[in-house]
Amino acid sequence: MSSTANAIADAFLGVLNALAPIIEGATEIITFMALTYVMTMVIARILGGLFV
């Protein structure tokens, strides 16, 4: 690896380290929203099946 590639890699790792907590928080929120959406769809299916 050249020194330029090393510098780019170091900068990239620095950015990743800075973003890691934000990404973790966002992942938790997205996971929660996805689970909520799936549960809503399942409940809607069940209720739809009952009423139809």
UniProtKB/Swiss-Prot annotation:
GO cellular component terms given for this protein: host cell membrane; membrane
Main location: host cell
Subcellular localization, as worded in the UniProt entry: Host membrane
TM regions (residue ranges): 11-31, 32-52
Keywords: Host membrane, Membrane, Transmembrane, Transmembrane helix
Membrane topology: Multi-pass membrane protein
UniProt protein name: Transmembrane protein ORF52
Species this chain originates from: Acidianus filamentous virus 1 (isolate United States/Yellowstone) (AFV-1)
